[in-house]
């Protein structure tokens, strides 16, 4: 059974700016993968301990999809999306 997926404002802002159709399709596929199995990806440590990051490739570049989850209500919050460069620094802000 799939989990319910919610988007944060940060994620929506980045998603709206995507212009390449293949990147949008790859992002949608990554979101579906996370919704079907939230344990995919890796859990971060330290300051970002509640964050799960799923890595995927699009057009030869590595992208990261950051999410948090509520296990009791089976809800996933999409927190951030972007290339690896400065991804974690921007999330800490």
Where in the sequence are the language-model features?
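Arg/Lys-rich, positively charged N-terminal/basic patches that mediate binding to nucleic acids
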Residues: 1-30
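Alpha-helical interaction segments
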Residues: 1-6, 41-46, 53, 77-78
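Enriched for short, Lys/Arg-rich terminal
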Residues: 4, 58-64, 68-93
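Residue-level recognition of oxygen-bearing side chains
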Residues: 10, 39, 86
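Conserved catalytic core of Hanks-type protein kinase domains
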Residues: 17, 33-34, 81
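Hydrophobic alpha-helical segments
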Residues: 24-27, 38, 63
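A short, surface-exposed loop/turn module that caps and links secondary-structure elements
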Residues: 32-58
């Amino acid at each position: 059974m799939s989990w319910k997926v919610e988007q944060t404002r940060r994620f929506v802002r980045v998603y709206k700016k995507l212009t390449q159709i293949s990147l949008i399709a790859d992002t949608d596929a990554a979101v579906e993968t996370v919704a079907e199995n939230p344990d995919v990806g890796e859990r971060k440590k330290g300051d970002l301990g509640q964050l799960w990051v799923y890595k995927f490739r699009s057009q030869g570049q590595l992208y990261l999809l950051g999410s948090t989850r509520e296990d009791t209500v089976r809800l996933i919050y999409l927190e951030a999306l972007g290339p690896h460069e400065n991804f974690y620094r921007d999330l800490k802000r």
